[in-house]
Amino acid sequence: MKKIVIIDHFSQTPDEPGNNRFLYLAQMLCEIGCQVEIITTDFSHKAKKTRQTDMERLRELPYGFTMLPEPGYPKNVCLTRFYSHYVLGKNLQKYLKTISKPDLIYAAIPSLDAAGAAAAYCKKQNIPFVIDIQDLWPEAFKLVFHIPVLSDLIFAPMTAQANRIYRQADKIVAVSETYKNRGLKSCKKDKEGLCVYLGTDLAKFDESAAGIAVDKPADQLWIAYAGTLGHSYNIEIVLDALNLLPDDMASKVVFKVFGDGPLMERFQAYAQKCKVKVDFLGRLDYGSMTAYLKHSDIAVNPIVKGAAQSIINKHADYAAAGLPVVSTQECPEYRMLLEQYGCGINCDPENPKQVADALQKLLQKEAMRHEMGFNSRKMAQERFDRAHTYQGILAEIEKLVR
């Protein structure tokens, strides 16, 4: 029996809401006969507090689930966070010395501290090291601290750290072609890499949505946003666009916002000026969110100019729900997917009028919504269904541990 260790700094516990890639992968590895342990932190990045976890439930899992101590931090962007990650990395180094040698380590990036500790351990023990790039660090931080030249100098140590990790990987896996190509620039051992979108399990998505009743008035049209309410996401451009809709149309529209984050209160205050009804529903359990998305009419993907995001969770959820998407994301990869499948409208990230025109077109034309929605679901089946796409990850792991 091959022993696989998965290191995911920002994992979720099974009793927390979400649709985590690594829990799903751990389950798949167990089903093919591997012994699996997930190593993460006892600090919840989303809740910004130490986890209160049902340990009995953890013991019932088919894989091990280890939470290492981390001091924590109050905000996504603060110096305390970097120190907290440093401590977690040191605790991971110590913990890896106590376990029996695994056959392979599969580590998520970010964080760089956790992945760096894993890289050092794999080099010393001469075992295969696979990284799965979920986000680009320090590129994501440069969006917040965007000062030409100075930002590059400040984040130079993180860039060097990321390059060292990429260089050592035996295999680069990533959630987008964009991220994969960044890793391959520095990688010495892997020249091809593997792009596997975060995705979702379509069968489970449909089952979850079908099991929850949603009360939607027949005369309403719902525009949905699902995800973090943070610096990379421009909810305000959607609100500005909604204010540009004709009054008779605006009266039928409800903007449903699913999620929370550091800018939630700011967005809620801004929404007070919106002539369209706005519902902030907070972070729902994944099943409830799927049901609401299935009952929605249009999805919005309002990502700010210059953001590092590529293919992300909400893309899979919108596609699985069969929703047409109005997107302000600059990432060529996602823009191309929307155009290739004919399932959305790309807009300028700083042009509310363009967003309003796109929304108005879809709100007016039911046939267009249905056609784009059908195409969106087709994209989910072909590009985002984990039951099929994650087989590629399993194949790479099996190849490395033979």
Describe every region a protein language model picked out.
Residues 178, 199:
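Carbohydrate-associated surface elements
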Residues 361, 368-383:
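A short, well-ordered alpha-helix in the C-terminal region of glycosyltransferases
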Residues 93-94, 116, 120-124, 152-172:
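Membrane-proximal helix-turn-helix segments that form the acceptor-binding/catalytic region
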Residues 233, 285-292, 299-319, 326-336:
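Nucleotide-sugar-dependent
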Residues 5, 215-243, 256:
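Conserved donor-binding/catalytic core segment of Leloir-type glycosyltransferases
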Residues 250, 265-290:
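Nucleotide-activated donor-binding/catalytic signature segment of Leloir-type glycosyltransferases, i.e.
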Residues 1-60, 198, 240-247:
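N-terminal subdomain of nucleotide-sugar transferases
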